[in-house]
Amino acid sequence: MSRSEKLTGEHLAPEPAEMARLVAGTHHNPHGILGAHEYDDHTVIRAFRPHAVEVVALVGKDRFSLQHLDSGLFAVALPFVDLIDYRLQVTYEGCEPHTVADAYRFLPTLGEVDLHLFAEGRHERLWEVLGAHPRSFTTADGVVSGVSFAVWAPNAKGVSLIGEFNGWNGHEAPMRVLGPSGVWELFWPDFPCDGLYKFRVHGADGVVTDRADAFAFGTEVPQQTASRVTSSDYTWGDDDWMAGRALRNPVNEAMSTYEVHLGSWRPGLSYRQLARELTDYIVDQGFTHVELLPVAEHPFAGSWGYQVTSYYAPTSRFGTPDDFRALVDALHQAGIGVIVDWVPAHFPKDAWALGRFDGTPLYEHSDPKRGEQLDWGTYVFDFGRPEVRNFLVANALYWLQEFHIDGLRVDAVASMLYLDYSRPEGGWTPNVHGGRENLEAVQFLQEMNATAHKVAPGIVTIAEESTPWSGVTRPTNIGGLGFSMKWNMGWMHDTLDYVSRDPVYRSYHHHEMTFSMLYAFSENYVLPLSHDEVVHGKGTLWGRMPGNNHVKAAGLRSLLAYQWAHPGKQLLFMGQEFGQRAEWSEQRGLDWFQLDENGFSNGIQRLVRDINDIYRCHPALWSLDTTPEGYSWIDANDSANNVLSFMRYGSDGSVLACVFNFAGAEHRDYRLGLPRAGRWREVLNTDATIYHGSGIGNLGGVDATDDPWHGRPASAVLVLPPTSALWLTPA
């Protein structure tokens, strides 16, 4: 039976005030007006479809035409109650009729428990309830598939869903707020599985903005800014890696990390191409881990990823989230751990992103003296707000769980810890005790670290922290921040200052190479020669070395051997493993051509490959990195000869003697104290001809005799090549 006659009812039109809010986009509960509503003896169906020329309700085999009341609101009164199911057939000018389930007849997709946990800041899988999620519901007329959307905007006057599906029209899909939670929600049937969308937010300040989804899993390729509905059907192949990860403690294991900016390692490669080429290269070079500069979506490529706008979306520049999963999977199957840089300290002010999201300071602190980072022109998160803290903690867990990431290197921790960080006098507000410590940030970092290690055992968290803050790597249960490791910025600065000097003057600065051992075991350290040291006019590691090309190459080889021998884990930025001569720029690729044009670059690359192989095979270089038992000086005081020497010890009883000649001339007949007599094998000589060195050395080893020296029971006489490193082990 077909019915198209107009039916009327006393409840056909909503109250004028409600209608006005609906049209203005500021109604907090459009579901209370739209959809099907039962009265005493009839049911009213209302649909808000501006620009539609006809709307028909399909109830079984019956058709009921909705009357256009005003401003795009259509309604019809059905002469019965207990309506089980219906569809809407909507026709626009010049278009064929389109039949769809009514979005305003579905219950909320978030439960009370989810909202309660979020309000308390304790929802550990928050990304599963906020954002965009494809869903299906079984109704009397069949299965209805679509996408549920949920966004936190507690001070907004109204929120609407806009996208390709409705021509970016801000009227057709108003969302409802779920009680006092501040979460706005809507399920939209038949939403495209990879459709673009945003939220049109009527801010508390009267400004209407179109916002990207803070929890979006996918985005448009920058400079476009819309969010994209994204789901995963990826099948992982790294079960063995993940099972082993849960049993490991990275602090006591080998860890040499290759730091990579994906866009400029070899420009033009996708995630899946990188899964082959980058993985093969890292395996060939022998690194145990790769650290990726931020992969979360960021609009400005020149920020290198450190100004994030979509914290839950891998950048779409190189492919889809599943493509990124394939990259991580390939690295894991090759035995390579994956660390990503994570940026919870601050976020950019783009008007379509997180800043003043609902017309008020929401994600950022409301006090400008705490809520803005002046140096970078960015906002600072309000770490004391439970929902914001939950957003960030859940984000850390998201990368660890959804993408199998093995570690987070937390950027700019010092800026989080201190309220007066890079602020002028009078430009900051003290904490409740009158101090400069950001107590809320401390609590956030402790919560993040404790939760991450609980949820994903075996992962590593690393702090980029350059101040004397005590206990960065101390467990949270004894008052520490709970990081696994922190960057040793002091070691980096002192070492680079020293090796940059002409050898003639190094003896006057010998303390720069010994000072780090006064605090080497106060924290668990990473020794970083990172991207920060090859930008902004600093040149490159190669460029810092004094002398001609032969001397520069020798200097860089000895520096790298010193880094690998010093207590702490290693991190080296891409390009430095072959001595790139040009300063790095994200706008172009590495100078791979150097490997075809000169032997020095090939020699440095070969050295890095070999020291990684030696490093992994010698627990003395890593198993006791964080305790004094893993290290002792042989001679820290030979400044006259620019020589340093020390022993490394492994938890398995192994030993390694390391000698560094930072003078520009060789030293013959150099006596070195050793712990035992007998044959000592030269496992590394950075001056070997295979590294394009001069070939000066000890013919593969030396014989130690029972002649005490340097306070040790035995000694050997060595030849120390100029600007070189020697590593020796008992034969």
Swiss-Prot record:
Disulfide partners: 193-617
Family annotation (SMART domains): Aamy
A Pfam family reported for this protein in Swiss-Prot or TrEMBL: CBM_48
GO biological process per UniProt: capsule polysaccharide biosynthetic process; glycogen biosynthetic process
SUPFAM superfamilies: (Trans)glycosidases, E set domains, Glycosyl hydrolase domain
Pathway(s) served: Glycan biosynthesis; glycogen biosynthesis; Capsule biogenesis; capsule polysaccharide biosynthesis
GO MF annotation terms: 1,4-alpha-glucan branching enzyme activity; cation binding; hydrolase activity, hydrolyzing O-glycosyl compounds
Organism superkingdom: Bacteria
Enzyme class: transferase
Alphabetical UniProt keywords: Capsule biogenesis/degradation, Carbohydrate metabolism, Disulfide bond, Glycogen biosynthesis, Glycogen metabolism, Glycosyltransferase, Transferase
Catalysis: reaction(s): Transfers a segment of a (1->4)-alpha-D-glucan chain to a primary hydroxy group in a similar glucan chain
Entry's family note: Belongs to the glycosyl hydrolase 13 family. GlgB subfamily.
Quaternary context: Monomer.
Role according to the record: Essential enzyme that catalyzes the formation of the alpha-1,6-glucosidic linkages in glucan chains by scission of a 1,4-alpha-linked oligosaccharide from growing alpha-1,4-glucan chains and the subsequent attachment of the oligosaccharide to the alpha-1,6 position. Is involved in the biosynthesis of both glycogen and capsular alpha-D-glucan.
Name of the protein in question: 1,4-alpha-glucan branching enzyme GlgB
Provenance organism: Mycobacterium tuberculosis (strain CDC 1551 / Oshkosh)
Organism placement in taxonomy: Bacteria, Bacillati, Actinomycetota, Actinomycetes, Mycobacteriales
Gene: glgB
